[in-house]
Amino acid sequence: MSALDKTMYFDFGQNEKKDVHQTLETVYNSLEEKGYNPINQIVGYLLSGDPAYIPRLNDARNLIRKHERDEIIEELVRAYLDKGEK
């Protein structure tokens, strides 16, 4: 069986999860500091991909753009489901 016939496996590593979590905290705090509703703004960004929903304050816009939106959503879903298990 050649390497092309094998299913690829992607591991969303622990460091990636921590980075996404830290980024979301920074973005959330920056949005609050600017007087915006952080949840609405983050959802707007995740749905549209438009970075204008995120302020430049504290480099939040550049930080969130370092992550793919699907990675952020994956981390949010994982955190939500993990919280429900406890």
Curated annotation (Swiss-Prot):
HAMAP family: UPF0297. Belongs to the UPF0297 family. This is UPF0297 protein LSL_1110. The lineage of its organism: Bacteria, Bacillati, Bacillota, Bacilli, Lactobacillales.
